[in-house]
């Protein structure tokens, strides 16, 4: 394995370890040694790959965002997807986002922690703003291709991302028996498809 591949794999191992740690306790209470222990590496290794604990968090955000962008690109460029109508393609994308992001309690728990950190950490806030702006722009571009009212596609994109974030928060607070998440998500998609 090439040195750069080993480096990338080791960094990914450490980022996944941070995710594991954040399932158990807050970022503030998580130490470099905790992350190293979960990653099964000496804590000195973390300092080789990352400048600080905050740097691990910032790179973790990039890692998650890049992974989901890659998965969305795979959906968009899947050989069968190009034959789908705009509405059916949006249904596929929404189904993916709903399952992989909105209803993923583990990921939501981690990002709630990151949102809290962003209140006090400008670098984390900037990283989140950038990530959300990218999501909004991707949906704006896709909505413009199929929506009748292109002047409002950007607003619709913001509403969609904000709705998903709200549902993500709800999915960590409410149990499935208390709130029918799938029904709410399906109705939201129906409303969007009506405008296409």
Predicted feature locations:
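Short, basic, alpha-helical segments at the C-terminal edge of helix-turn-helix-like DNA-binding modules
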Residues: 32, 62-69
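Amphipathic alpha-helical packing segments from all-alpha helical-bundle domains
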Residues: 103-112, 119-147
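Hydrophobic alpha-helical connector segments
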Residues: 59, 73-103, 156-160, 182
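Short alpha-helical scaffolding segments that buttress acidic/His motifs in well-ordered protein cores
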Residues: 93, 97, 111-115, 160, ...
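Helix-turn-helix
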Residues: 13, 21-59
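Hydrophobic/aromatic-rich alpha-helical bundle segments in the mid-to-C-terminal region
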Residues: 125-129, 145-196
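Residues in soluble alpha-helical coiled-coils and helical-bundle/repeat scaffolds
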Residues: 51-55, 80-84, 98, 102, ...
């Amino acid at each position: 394995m090439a040195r750069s591949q080993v480096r990338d794999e080791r960094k990914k191992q450490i980022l996944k370890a941070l995710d594991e740690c954040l399932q158990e306790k807050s970022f503030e209470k998580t130490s470099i040694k905790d992350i190293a222990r979960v990653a099964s590496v000496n804590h000195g290794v973390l300092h080789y790959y990352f400048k600080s604990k905050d740097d691990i968090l910032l790179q973790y955000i990039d890692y998650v965002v890049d992974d989901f962008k890659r998965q969305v690109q795979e959906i968009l460029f899947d050989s069968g997807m190009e034959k789908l109508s705009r509405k059916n393609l949006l249904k596929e994308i929404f189904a993916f986002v709903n399952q992989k992001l909105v209803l993923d309690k583990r990921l939501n728990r981690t990002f709630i922690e990151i949102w809290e950190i962003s209140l006090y950490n400008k670098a984390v806030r900037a990283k989140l703003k950038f990530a959300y702006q990218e999501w909004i722009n991707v949906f704006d571009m896709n909505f413009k291709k199929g929506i009748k009212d292109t002047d409002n596609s950007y607003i619709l994109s913001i509403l969609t991302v904000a709705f998903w974030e709200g549902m993500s928060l709800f999915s960590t607070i409410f149990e499935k028996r208390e709130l029918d998440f799938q029904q709410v998500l399906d109705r939201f998609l129906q409303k969007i498809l009506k405008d296409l």
